[in-house]
Amino acid sequence: SAASDVYKRQQARFANAGNFTLLHEDFLETDLTAVAPLLGAKCAVAANLPYYVTTPVCMKLLTSALPIERMALMLQKEAAERFTALPGSRQYGPLTVLAQRYYDIKFLMELSPARYYPQPEVDSAVLTLARRPGVTDLPALPRVLASAFSMRRKTLMNNLRSAGLSRENAEALLEKCGIPPAARAEALPPEAFACLAEAML
């Protein structure tokens, strides 16, 4: 395959590089905890993402325990807009909250189909993400987001109850974070979800 040919060429090119490890794997199937020892205390990600796996790849990166300090991503423009979306917009969702919680995001440039060969049918974009200093990991955040956005048109209260919380516990959680009982997940800023995740620790 073309991917195997590229791998073989790069393997030969970097055969004598002592600080370089080349892996030929499906990223979505790769155990990132096994890769972590190769990366040191900090790492960066540079990727031209296949459009059809953009969301699962980005969610895996954003929820991993890897010490990712910076990312530079080329991806479909529509997917890029989800990183910078505002609460209440159609693009706003779990990926948005995770990215904005942990990273400062810059929309660098837009790329038209004419910049590629063969030409895709969609526009592309380049984003950079820089880890926000002092922001701690919240292991419960992905679970909170999965519950909160499970049914977008339902209230956060209903979604939390569907996830197994009693009405009393759900009400107490929302009150602690200053969230109205009738609020929907798509209308809340990332800080609200961070509060919920911290309260659930």
Where are these regions (language model features)?
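Residue-level marker of motif borders
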Residues: 71, 182-184
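An accessory alpha-helical subdomain
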Residues: 125-129, 137-171, 177-180, 187, ...
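Accessory (non-catalytic) regions of SAM-dependent nucleic-acid methyltransferases
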Residues: 197-200
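Catalytic cores of RNA-modifying enzymes
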Residues: 1-147, 175
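Short secondary-structure boundary/hinge segments and terminal tails
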Residues: 116, 191-192
